[in-house]
């Protein structure tokens, strides 16, 4: 049987030009966390700011400036189409990994509390490891698209991206920054699993990584002290267990609804890093269990929204966007879980910030970039869905 030739060419489908709405629940959740974070940083830092800078709003003002820079960087990231990230993700990751080397060079990197993680650039302190986490997601997403068959069917396809990721992780460990390393590796492993990698390499790699982490803890007095103090902070509440015991006291004082915004006591020289890593403890004291549940719900929603965008992208045959969205969802979920877990004493102290909230310009910038990329992906998916629906509804598309 021969196919019948069409009597006349089908008319071209006209392009639909319209503005597609943003994912407002995602946007409002992120903006709400940013605003809430600024309020709580202000509350948590007033005592220490008054003591060190003779201005109770010193850290609040700096945090507000960082918020402005982060939002501008987010707008810039939103204007970048996803295919640009796909094409340049590997180069962004390599460039940020090279900057990690600069951090470790004496005279370039800045050391705070025994950790060398920053490069001073005028009034800003750039923390490359924060950007490496995001660029690692972009790199691995692009790799999974380009080498999908190898990742699924060949061990070499599974190992190749881990060589670069492992090199960056080693540089971050040398700072030292154990928490960022763990979150980045866990996020990448989750993305490889979503990419279809077989289970056996995961088991072998997890065993190797687990043995390596145990070795690092055993042979590092600094890390060993943190683990021991985490297991029983009340054994030495005025030395190795001081930070965690003070955090738990803050949660205990907060009870159900807290002592009131600004009325917390633990932030007044009792709880170290109250406006950075241990900000949730201040929230727990001043807003109680109710405030903490709202905070947890916001992070759960943000992570779920990112994952759902990834599922939609996969259904529309947009694999890069799918991997990026799900990678960002994994990263936000993991980092917020680790930070909150450290504050309530179910995980050892890691030195990780709470995304979108803790004091620190680099974390805010990377968080805003990540949300902007998610919003851009969502708008692109809405356009694809709208055009597909339009084509299905035209008479010539059904001919």
From Swiss-Prot:
Recite the UniProt keywords alphabetically.
Cell cycle, Cell division, Cell inner membrane, Cell membrane, Cell shape, Cell wall biogenesis/degradation, Glycosyltransferase, Membrane, Peptidoglycan synthesis, Transferase, Transmembrane, Transmembrane helix
Any single GO molecular-function term of the entry would be: lipid-linked peptidoglycan transporter activity
Could you list the residue ranges that cross the membrane? 26-46, 65-85, 89-109, 118-138, 154-174, 178-198, 199-219, 282-302, 327-347, 354-374
Answer yes or no on keyword 4Fe-4S. no
Give the pathway: Cell wall biogenesis; peptidoglycan biosynthesis
Topology in membrane: Multi-pass membrane protein
Q: Can you name a GO cellular component term?
A: plasma membrane
Taken from the record's topology, the Cytoplasmic segments are: 1-25, 86-88, 139-153, 303-326, 375-399
Protein's GO biological process: cell wall organization; FtsZ-dependent cytokinesis; peptidoglycan biosynthetic process; regulation of cell shape
InterPro entries in the cross-refs: FtsW, FtsW/RodA
Enumerate the Pfam families for this protein.
FTSW_RODA_SPOVE
Disulfide bonds, paired cysteine numbers: none
Where is this chain's protein located in or outside the cell? Cell inner membrane
The segments annotated as topological domain Periplasmic are 47-64, 110-117, 175-177, 220-281, 348-353
The record's family statement is: Belongs to the SEDS family. FtsW subfamily.
> Any idea what job this protein has?
Peptidoglycan polymerase that is essential for cell division.
Q: What is this protein called?
A: Probable peptidoglycan glycosyltransferase FtsW
Q: What is the lineage of its organism?
A: Bacteria, Pseudomonadati, Pseudomonadota, Gammaproteobacteria, Chromatiales
């Amino acid at each position: 049987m021969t196919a019948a030739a069409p009597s006349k060419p089908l008319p071209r489908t006209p392009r639909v030009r319209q503005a597609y709405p943003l994912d407002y629940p995602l946007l409002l959740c992120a903006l709400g966390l940013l605003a809430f974070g600024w309020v709580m940083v202000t509350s948590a830092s007033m005592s220490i700011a008054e003591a060190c800078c003779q201005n109770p709003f010193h850290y609040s003002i700096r945090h507000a400036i960082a918020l402005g820079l982060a939002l501008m960087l987010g707008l810039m990231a939103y204007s970048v189409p996803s295919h640009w990230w796909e094409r340049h993700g590997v180069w962004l990751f390599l460039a940020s990994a090279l900057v990690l080397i600069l951090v470790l060079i004496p005279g370039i990197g800045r050391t705070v509390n025994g950790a060398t993680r920053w490069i001073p650039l005028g009034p800003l302190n750039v923390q490359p490891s924060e950007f490496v986490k995001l660029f690692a997601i972009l790199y691995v997403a692009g790799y999974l698209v380009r080498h999908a068959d190898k990742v699924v069917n060949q061990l070499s396809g599974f190992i190749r991206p881990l060589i670069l990721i492992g090199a960056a992780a080693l540089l971050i460990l040398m700072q030292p920054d154990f928490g960022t390393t763990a979150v980045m590796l866990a996020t990448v492993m989750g993305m490889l699993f979503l990419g279809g990698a077989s289970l056996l390499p995961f088991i072998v790699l997890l065993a190797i990584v687990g043995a390596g982490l145990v070795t690092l803890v055993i042979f590092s007095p600094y890390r060993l002290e943190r683990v021991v103090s985490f297991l029983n902070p009340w054994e030495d509440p005025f030395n190795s267990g001081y930070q965690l015991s003070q955090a738990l006291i803050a949660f205990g004082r907060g009870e159900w609804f807290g002592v009131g915004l600004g009325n917390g006591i633990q932030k007044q020289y009792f709880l170290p890093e109250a406006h950075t890593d241990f900000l949730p403890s201040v929230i727990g004291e001043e807003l109680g269990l109710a405030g903490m549940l709202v905070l947890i719900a916001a992070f759960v929603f943000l992570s779920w929204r990112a994952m759902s965008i990834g599922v939609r992208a996969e259904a529309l045959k947009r694999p890069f966007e799918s991997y990026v969205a799900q990678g960002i969802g994994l990263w936000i979920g993991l980092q917020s879980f680790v930070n909150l877990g450290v504050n309530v004493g179910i995980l050892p102290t890691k030195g990780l910030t709470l995304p979108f909230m803790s004091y620190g310009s680099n974390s805010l910038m990377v968080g805003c970039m990540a949300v902007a990329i998610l919003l851009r992906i969502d708008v692109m998916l809405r356009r694809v869905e709208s055009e597909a629906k339009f084509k299905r509804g035209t008479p010539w598309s059904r001919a």
